[in-house]
């Protein structure tokens, strides 16, 4: 859940779609994929029915493999260090560069990114760090898992970003 420009409740995914469409990005593939997930109730089957780049498929597979471990400390670590602790700083740099382009149609995208920065940086990030500490406690094996899987999450995210960068 989130709020839009007029402070109305909305779905964060809808903010993403609106911001992408405003800058002229084609959102048909993501909409088709989400529709396939809903219809199939199985992400792997939905992937097979969708035109998704291998880099994105690999990233999704890694994500679902982590979920399949059913180990809360691993799932939380990957989420925290592969996303919550990382993305706000990245988005701040994107927002700064977009703000420097006069006349661009980036208001919706800026709003979407700023919402991420606010939610992830101010609220989710600090809470996630406390959660990891609580889940791992004094168990060195859990901390080792957290480090191992978080490092792999970063590698997977870099591979995805490298692909995205090559397509821009």
Over which residues does each language-model region extend?
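Non-heme di-metal
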Residues: 1-168
């Amino acid at each position: 859940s989130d709020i839009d420009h007029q402070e109305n409740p909305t779905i964060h995914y809808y903010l993403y779609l609106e911001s992408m469409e405003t800058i002229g990005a084609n959102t048909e593939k993501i909409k088709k994929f989400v529709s396939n997930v809903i219809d199939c109730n199985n992400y792997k089957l939905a992937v097979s029915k969708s035109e998704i780049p291998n880099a994105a498929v690999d990233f999704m597979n890694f994500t679902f493999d982590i979920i399949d471990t059913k180990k809360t400390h691993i799932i939380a670590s990957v989420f925290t260090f592969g996303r919550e602790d990382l993305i706000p700083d990245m988005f701040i740099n994107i927002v700064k560069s977009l703000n420097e382009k006069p006349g661009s149609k980036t208001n919706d995208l800026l709003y979407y990114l700023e919402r991420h920065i606010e939610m992830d940086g101010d609220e989710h990030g600090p809470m996630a760090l406390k959660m990891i500490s609580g889940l791992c406690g004094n168990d060195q094996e859990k901390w080792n898992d957290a480090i191992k899987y978080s490092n792999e999450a970063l590698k997977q995210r870099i591979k995805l970003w490298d692909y995205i960068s090559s397509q821009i």
